[in-house]
Amino acid sequence: VSDVNQRLVDQYTEIARLAGALAHEIKNPLSTIRLNMELLAEDFSQDPENPLYRRALNKVKVVQQECQRLQDLLDDFLNFAKVRRLNLEPTNLNHQVRQVLGFFQPKAKESNIEIIDYLASDLPMVLLDRKAFDGALLNLLLNAQQAMPNGGQLVVRTSGARDGVALDLIDTGCGMDAHTLSHLFEAFFSTKRGGTGLGLATARKIVEAHGGQIRVQSELGRGTQFTITLPVPAQLTAGAVTGQLPGPSQP
């Protein structure tokens, strides 16, 4: 079984390498197109009263928008295809959640979203690649923001779970139908205009790389709940209260 798993890992690594190389090759001509569109936009802006220039400028702006969309897609794809070698460190989950919420708070305020947090005080430490996990959590928060275009509430809750810890994100947004739920974590699936469909797929990939799981419950018109569960290695349990790794045993 281990040989089969290693072959699968090797095959995935090679596919990811080729995909990344292809994406980088696309980026180079895309950068040239974007630069020339900027130069054309400057030229056509010289005479705003000229109807021919105005029409040309509008067309240039459309091309610029599509170039930006392709750039976003490439960036998201490179992040999704990346072979992740996690730098796992003992981490206080509540501290990490607070940091990401602090970064997200201005966006929530702009969207009239109230964040309510219930962070359990007695959580054991978990092993996280903090940068990767922050990216996954931010993807979920942005997804909740997009689900509440008219504002709402977002509850962020941590708690103990069987053999680990749980992180819940509960929004009062538009919710999802059964079809959307069944395809939610598929790469390139998106219900948003201009969306790449890679944010949630990448988030799940990161959570699963940590040995965790991500689940979702949703009701159309009522809201959505994402739940991340993460394992707690036995050697970290002894340091759960103080947030320290257990020291060496005394003779």
Each PLM stretch: what is its role?
Residues 151-163:
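Short beta-strand/loop element within the Bergerat-fold HATPase_c
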Residues 206-207:
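Detector for a conserved hydrophobic position within an alpha-helical segment of the HATPase_c
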Residues 2-25:
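Conserved HAMP-HisKA connector
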Residues 176-188:
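Short conserved segment of the HATPase_c
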Residues 89-101:
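A conserved beta-strand-to-alpha-helix junction within the catalytic ATP-binding
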Residues 30-68, 88:
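Histidine phosphotransfer helical core of two-component systems
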Residues 98, 109, 114-124:
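Conserved catalytic submotifs in the C-terminal HATPase_c
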